[in-house]
């Protein structure tokens, strides 16, 4: 996806335009790739082309923009010269409340060598994100992060385990070989997946919030169905009640459980994806790019919720993200993927230089 986005960006830059509008152009790019792109946009603006840059990434806004405006709930709530404001003020205006500073929540948690997931010599043929030889183990009860540059294979791992792309190698779940080539096997075994492609894979855009939330649990576990002998019928009342519960728990902004998902904002759609995964009561949850393209308030809600369900429900989580700071803030360990393989596994409080070296392919001290 990152490479496709860059191609689209280049096509726009080569047209003879007086104004360019970019809507979340770096959402699928890593931090280093986004930085190079911002330099390009700055050069375009310096040449006399006006740029409207729409982004939830505050670092990018502060670095690139001359002026900043904030829309919240469809209204203009803030307008200022960038040099006269700061990230904290912008963030608070975006969400309408003060935000807590990021911190490393899970530093120095201890786990036994009880592995819920063991991946060995795993290869996934996912276009633009192939892995060549991935091996790692995930301890029961931890939040395991997967990071790396776009195009190096990090997002293909969860997709391969859930049978989305041709794969080979060994995947052990609770000590037993997982037949990941069989569609739906991971779901049947008690895993769940929140895809990075929420519109293409994660949601039924023309269906209601309630239907989207209960769909997987209904199909896999036969819940939310009224049974009449050999026949069954969708239990709309029960599904609406459960959807109402999840709407409140995840602070989903909507008109109710009957609202069509395609009409929700990106952040609220992502919360529906999260609710859908959790209603199947997984023991192991994979989340891929959970905060891509959503506002800072929704990001905080989702990240806090991941930590909450990990600690309160004991759900083991594998989180793939291009945002290293997010991995730092919630993960117990972080694997860096480069050139289709695991370059190293680090603790979240490991020196930044070690993360940088692993991402550059130069290697770093392993603090696992």
Labelled PLM ranges:
Residues 1-368:
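Glycine-rich phosphate-binding loops of nucleotide-dependent enzymes
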